[in-house]
C-alpha cells in the first residue's frame, strides 16, 4: 500500500489509498453506498481519535454530495472519483490529516471490510432508504426516563426493532450544520441500523459503547460483538438526569467489586510542572 509521506496528507489521499486497496476484490468501490455503509462501520471504532470527528464529518459530506449527484458524477474509476472530490470546497478537498489518523482509518477500514460484508443488496437497500428519507418521519414510542415517567423498560432487542422499522427513517440529504456529529447504532443478529445528525454540544457530550460479553469471547476481536454505539449531545434535563443516574448506578456497582485504585493522573488541559 502506497502512502503519501513526502507531502502533506489530505482527504483525497485517504480516499485514494482505500480505493486502491479494495478495488480488486470489491468492485463496489464505485458505488457510493459502499463508502457510506463502511463509514458507518468505521465510525464505531474511532472514538478515541481526536481528529476523527472532523474527518468523519467531511467524509460524510463528500459521500452525501456524491450520492446526490450519483448519475451526474458517473464514477467508474479512481480518476473520476478523485476528479470530483478535488473540486469540492477547499475545507474538504484540502483537509490536512496527520499520519496517525490517516493510518488508523486505513487499518480500521480494512478490518471492517473484511469482517462486515457489504454486498450489492446492502448498497441497493441503503440507497432506497436514503431516497425515501426526505419524506419520512420517525415515530418511536416514547421511552420513560428514570425520575420522570419511570425506569426505561425497552430491551436492546426492542429498541433495535423500533429503529429498524422502515417507517422510522428520518432526516434529509441536505447538508446539516452544527458543532458535533452524533449517531446511534444498534446491532442484532448480524444486522445494524444507524441514525446520524449534526447538533450543538450540550451540557454533556456522551459516547457509549455496549458489547455482548459472551459473544465477544467468541470473536477474534472483542469489539466485533456490539449491541449499541451512541455518540450524542445531552442538554434535555430529563436526559441529563438519566445520564447522571446511570453514572451513579454504574459507579456504585463497580465500587462494590473492590477495585484497586491506580492513583491520580493529570486530566486533559492541565500541564505537568517542570522542575
Swiss-Prot record:
It comes from the Viruses. This is Non-structural protein NS2. The lineage of its organism: Viruses, Monodnaviria, Shotokuvirae, Cossaviricota, Quintoviricetes.
Amino acid at each position: 500500500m502506497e502512502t503519501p509521506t513526502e507531502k502533506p496528507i489530505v482527504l483525497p489521499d485517504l480516499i485514494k489509498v482505500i480505493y486502491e486497496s479494495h478495488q480488486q476484490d470489491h468492485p463496489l468501490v464505485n458505488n457510493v453506498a459502499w463508502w457510506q455503509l463502511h463509514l458507518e462501520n468505521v465510525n464505531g471504532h474511532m472514538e478515541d481519535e481526536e481528529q476523527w470527528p472532523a474527518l468523519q464529518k467531511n467524509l460524510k459530506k463528500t459521500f452525501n454530495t456524491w450520492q446526490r449527484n450519483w448519475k451526474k458524477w458517473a464514477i467508474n474509476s479512481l480518476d473520476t472519483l478523485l476528479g470530483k472530490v478535488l473540486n469540492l470546497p477547499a475545507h474538504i478537498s484540502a483537509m490536512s490529516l496527520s499520519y496517525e489518523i490517516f493510518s488508523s482509518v486505513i487499518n480500521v477500514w480494512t478490518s471492517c471490510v473484511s469482517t462486515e460484508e457489504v454486498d450489492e443488496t446492502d448498497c441497493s437497500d441503503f440507497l432506497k432508504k436514503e431516497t425515501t428519507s426526505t419524506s419520512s418521519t420517525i415515530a418511536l414510542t416514547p421511552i420513560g426516563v428514570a425520575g420522570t415517567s419511570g425506569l426505561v423498560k425497552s430491551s436492546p432487542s426492542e429498541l433495535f426493532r423500533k429503529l429498524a422499522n422502515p417507517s422510522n427513517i428520518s432526516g434529509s440529504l441536505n447538508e446539516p450544520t452544527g458543532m458535533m456529529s452524533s449517531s446511534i447504532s444498534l446491532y442484532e443478529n448480524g444486522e445494524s441500523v444507524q441514525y446520524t445528525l449534526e447538533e450543538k454540544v450540550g451540557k454533556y457530550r456522551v459516547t457509549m459503547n455496549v458489547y455482548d460479553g459472551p459473544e465477544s469471547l467468541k470473536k477474534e476481536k472483542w469489539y466485533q460483538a456490539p449491541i449499541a454505539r451512541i455518540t450524542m449531545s445531552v442538554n434535555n434535563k430529563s436526559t441529563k438526569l438519566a445520564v447522571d443516574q446511570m453514572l451513579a448506578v454504574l459507579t456504585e456497582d463497580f465500587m462494590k467489586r473492590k477495585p484497586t485504585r491506580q492513583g491520580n493522573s493529570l486530566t486533559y488541559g492541565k500541564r505537568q510542572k517542570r522542575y
